[in-house]
Amino acid sequence: MSRLATKSLKGLRLRPSLPSTSPASPWLAATRLRRYASNEHKGNFKGQMVQSITQRLEREKADLERLGNLGEKKAVGINWSITASKSPFPPPSLPSSPSPAPSDPPPVVLMFGGMTYFLGTTRPHDPDPSSTLPLSATVPPRHKTGKASLEAAWADFVDIVGEANVSTLPDNLHAHSTSEWSSHPADPSQRPFCVVYPSTTDEVSLIMKVCHARRIPVVGYSGGTSLEGHFTPTRGGISIDFAHMNQIVALHKEDLDVVVQPAVGWESLNEELAEHNLFFPPDPGPGAMIGGMVGTGCSGTNAYRYGTMREWVLSLTVVLADGTVIKTRQRPRKSSAGYDLTKLFIGSEGTLGLVTEATLKVTVKPASSSVAVASFGSIREAADCVARVVGDGVPVAAVEILDDDQMRFINAAGATTRQWKEAPTIFFKFSGTAAGVKEQVALVRGLAKANGGLSFDFARSEDEMTELWSARKEALWSTMAVKKPGEHVWTGDVAVPMSRLPDIIEETKRDLKSSGLTSSIVGHVGDGNFHIILVYSDKERVLAEDCVHRMVKRAIEMEGTVTVCFLR
């Protein structure tokens, strides 16, 4: 018996069984097995423990012996050709004959053994884990967008939502294919055949079942404020517009969460939450709705302190491609049960399913808040100031940058109530207690001055705060206002590690200036993110493409990422 078994038995104050060589050993073992397996002693814990340990050790010993025998067999199989001449059982010699002298193995045996060894060492033992199927060889999705198929589907949609909620008007189809700032509007052949307006999750499910059965592609649509072509169709099919699904389903104030439908705008949601001293932090562009915000995993000016959309979604109700309805999880904040399906759907842009309901986290509004604006002599100085604020751990709520061209566009558009210094400008937002906000403002003022700040203004009232922050929210629309008829707007979204932010902003600004295109830089630089906005004519299309291509390359070289609608 092994030492472990003996030690275990001693711990139980039982005498170990006799060795297996003892004549009494089989009888004792059988007696003990019968004793502890009987109903009379079924509850005897010590007996069950002895039996369990003994059986386990016997199984382990048998496994080790079997493994050892298997290893010996493999070794003999591999080396048989080399050791064949040294058999441990040579044929006995005749008494009258002298013992034969040892001789070298035959050449054929040596040759065969060498070939076996060579093949055994060169042949891979495990399959190559890498994919051997090139992307070009994969089978693309096959859709049926012929006239007969789409017209038959139209009749099915009318049965589901009513004829008034299925539109084939050309203007409506165009609006669901492109936007004023889309750099790649859909070709007429790629526009949706119709736009369907469901009102419930069940209707969305029925619509998707029809499309799945008829192999019709689908694009979801909510606010239509995307800047990088997220809702632009490429295969025709249909567009599902969630305009009728715009209700706040339930507010759980005590739990700090709210259940909403996809066409609820973040601005209208915050108006409702403000009545309860609550707010929903993600704040992308004006007009954005929850469905699109989930689909794109949006950011916003509050992302520096509060994070992006990913941090504020608890659960989703999703309709899959075949019409199956799933709920990704329940409402509790903490859950480690199963896969994190919620995060999987956030940022998937409708490619995995259509969101018909979202449970969002909300938080209590800060007791105090303020806004400050600092201007600088160069874009590099402004970016360096941001890096210092972040590096020093100043707990500001938001950090936004607008370059000199963007400030000039805002003045020209007259979208705000004041004239701004046309210089690279940083907009800071502060929140917390009154004392905390005051301390943050003082720290940022000092850092701005140390990094070449030309001016520093901060809001002393709610009206001043609204006025100062209005310039940031009007950035895109101000640029749209300066473009001439026939010109287009192209936007790009770049993010890099914070340590590379000053470099990429400076190099991008220099490149934009040298291109001669009307352009600006604006963004949520607190987390290393900024946008470029290009205005170009049809003649300048190639020039704009080259500029965007260099920006993409620059971001990748700096270990960053880019979201841009870019086709070569």
PLM segments and residue spans:
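N-terminal flexible segment immediately upstream of the FAD-binding catalytic core
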Residues: 2-5, 22-209, 226-256, 406-415, ...
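Short, ordered loop/turn segments at secondary-structure junctions
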Residues: 222-225, 285, 401-404, 567
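FAD-binding subdomain of flavoenzyme oxidoreductases
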Residues: 247-254, 258-400
